[in-house]
Design a protein with these regions (language model features):
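Walker A/P-loop NTP-binding motif
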Residues: 66-78
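N-terminal pre-P-loop "Q-motif" helix
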Residues: 30-45
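Walker A/P-loop
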Residues: 48-68
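Conserved RecA-like ASCE ATPase "motif II neighborhood" in helicase/translocase motors
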Residues: 127-186
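Phosphate-binding P-loop
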Residues: 42-50, 78-79
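Short, small-residue-biased leader/transition segments that mark boundaries at the very start
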Residues: 1-7
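Conserved nucleotide-state-sensing and coupling region of NTP-binding domains
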Residues: 87-143
């Protein structure tokens, strides 16, 4: 699996067409911008990455960092991801975000044709599931106890925080400090020792 752009074009054409909302007709094909490719290469090439990606609204930050990039890492000849955690403003929000990657693993026939059945025989439920190759996926809400962020002895090695804040939180300085402390202490502390990609995405 050569590049993130290759896996995107090969396995996710349904994300790459802009359609007319009324007629459903294809208006144009959506291509990666250079910053998408640079970000993906940075994530892949830095096993202990700690990064914030701030892109304008509508620039597919969640699509890339929550779906394309982790699946690209997962399907490398030498697997580069073992335990992914998606963190949202609530557990429900995180579960919805994680549901996109779960749907691709379960129903994407191009992935299944090339990499085999992905739905594991073990637990396969909304918000927490394990793929057939053993990669674990978990949704986590803001402020949630990190004690659940383990799979036996395994720790997360890909944590992505997606739109953690909201208007109510931003108006309360103490809560902002509390969540900042939770991110720095609980989430950082949950990462696999010595390695692990920690990514935050948000709007400019």
């Amino acid at each position: 699996v050569g590049s993130e752009m290759c896996i995107r074009d090969s396995y996710f054409p349904h994300f790459l067409t802009l359609r007319d909302k009324t007629t459903g007709e294809v208006i144009r094909t959506i291509h990666n911008a250079p910053f998408h490719n640079a970000a993906a290469a940075k994530v892949k090439g830095t096993p202990n990455l700690k990064a914030v990606f701030m892109w304008p609204r509508g620039h597919a930050k969640s699509t890339h960092m929550d779906i394309f990039v982790p699946l690209w890492l997962m399907f490398q000849p030498k697997r580069l991801i073992n335990f992914m955690v998606v963190v949202g403003k609530s557990e429900d929000s995180a579960t919805r975000l994680l549901g996109d990657i779960q749907a691709e693993l379960e129903h994407n026939q191009r992935i299944i044709a090339d990499f085999g059945k992905q739905q594991g025989n073990a637990s396969w439920q909304d918000g927490e599931f394990k793929a057939a190759n053993g990669v674990k996926f978990l949704a986590c809400g803001r402020g949630q106890s990190p004690r659940g962020l383990r799979d036996r002895e395994a720790r997360p090695d890909y944590i992505v925080i997606d739109d953690l804040d909201d208007d109510e939180l931003c108006r309360n300085e103490k809560r902002v400090h509390d969540i900042t402390d939770w991110v720095k202490e609980a989430l950082f502390g949950a990462l696999d020792v010595g390695r692990g990609r920690f990514i935050m995405v948000g709007n400019l």
